[in-house]
Amino acid sequence: MEYARFTKLNLDLIKKNFFVRNSLYVTLTLAGIVMLYTIINWNTMPMTQRITGIYYFLIALHEIEEMKFPGGFVEMVVKLTGMPVKDMTIPHFCLFMITVYMMLIPFCLSSIHWLVIGPLVLGTIEPIAHFVVGKANPATKIYSPGIITAVIFMIPLDIYTFYYLFSVAPVSW
């Protein structure tokens, strides 16, 4: 009984947190700053940092499609998996934290070139995950929110990143 009350209190405090309530907008702001920095410093940045900056911006666009226009990807996954989630605030915040760890850290630690593998793996998994969820979507059998940006943006950037890492500069990273 005491644990349940403690857990509810912690969840209430977490949901009141600015970053939790506004995780999508914080992601968009950070991605915009990263993209602006990338554009301004393009000529002086290592290619892996450029790629990570582009990934960050594209993931932010991808999250807009997943959560807002048309939105509903997290809700669809929760429904399809039968997870007992009543409030979508926490899953959305988890998505924000994954984005920060997978994108912002590799971008800021640009001298550790192998960290670009995180965004590369995320960019590779995104289209696959959206095709799987789209196939399981009873309404359309093909579409899931996020699939358009995953296919149009992630696949080409993944192909270029693989090409760059294994052909152009295989030893330097």
What residue spans do the PLM features occupy?
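Core segments of transmembrane alpha-helices
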Residues: 25-34, 90-107, 149-158
